[in-house]
Amino acid sequence: NGKTDPGCRVRVNCHAVPGVWQYEALAFKPGLVMRWFRDGFCQLEKQQAEATGKDPYYLMDKEAAKVPAGCYGMMCTFSDVMNFISWKHASPTFTNFELDPEKFSRYTFYRAILENTAMVTKGHLELVKEATGNMPQEIVFAGGAAKSPLWCQIVADVLGLPVKVPVVKEATALGAAILAGY
């Protein structure tokens, strides 16, 4: 049986496989925020990507990797550890930055978004551990996140856990196919 979290901080879902439970902590905005940032502030990268056949996120990551961890003290809050019953989200903010374009370029802001998602992931894992007594030994990134070595590394550094990326990065279709044959 799946143990529920009385505080409703972790959602417990039955799995498609009988007797298996999924503990889920929710962070709704990371992918949406990254798309918003790309579309709103990285037109140059989108144009370069179109011209070179590269993904714009690859180009953004390449530059954001040059920004030191911690983003010169700037913090981003777009997603937060949340209680899924209340569906409340943090107000989107960037704080503690200066008007120094050498340090605080769009890539610093982008990296701060990546770091925010890593901190939210850490908070969610701590909630799952409180609810279940278990902590994963590794993290598996799939979907869009799996395409970013920088994001994988930031999450690995924040969690102190290895982040693995499967060969098949689009896990939804693969999972559906596996379950269809189950």
Model-found features: residue ranges?
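Glycine-rich phosphate-binding loop of actin/hexokinase-like ATP-binding domains
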Residues: 1-54, 70-98, 104, 165-168
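Activation-segment/catalytic-loop signature of the eukaryotic protein kinase fold
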Residues: 66-174
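Gly/Ser/Thr-rich beta-alpha loop segments that engage phosphate groups in nucleotides
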Residues: 4, 21, 145-146, 177
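Alpha-helical scaffold segments in soluble metabolic enzymes
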Residues: 32-40, 127, 154, 175, ...
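Generic recognition of flexible, low-complexity loop/linker segments
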Residues: 11, 23, 62-65, 127-128
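Residue-level preference for well-ordered alpha-helical positions
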Residues: 38-39, 45, 49, 129, ...
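Short, well-structured alpha-helical segments that form the helix of a local strand-helix-strand
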Residues: 52-68
